[in-house]
Amino acid sequence: MTTGREDITNNTGRTVAIGAAAGLVVGLLANLTRKAAVQAPTLLAGQWDEALAAEHAAALKIFDLLEKTDNHATARRSFLLMQLKHAISKHAFQEENVVYAMMRDQGLAEAADHLNHEHGYVKQYFFDLTEMDKGDPAWLPKLREFRGLIESHMREEEDDLFPKLRAKLSAEQNKHVTAAMSKEGFKLA
């Protein structure tokens, strides 16, 4: 036989455990929902090359917002740079782990290596811009230099290399690249 005090202790412990489990489930579901929302524009864009082009356009819109800032908008620059870094990092992860790997498998190794090499410079620009004082008069010119690299990289992919890869792949292989790329993007979304 238990005392009233033991019943209260047992019920309190059970209530806390149930509350903790419910909180964990809600947190996990919220994270999955957030990931789905971040990856949805890519999924809805269509095939892998169209999805990557849509991500390119989204990144350029963030560049546009950054270029409209002045040297006094340091908090806004920091926030937008963080958004840009997240968007491009997820994008690069998809390209490097699926698209560039498929390019190598399809005889486009030199081009894939070149694109991957450029991603190293993208990381360098992010480092430099993050380290610079956001009010520094040299910050915006550095951002514009970065945008020039990004736009050149995007044009090379969209106008030349991605069409070459798409043409080398069967419909089934293109479908597989789309699915694999979305899976990789979901990991970082």
In which residue ranges do the predicted regions lie?
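Small-residue-biased structural context
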Residues: 1-189
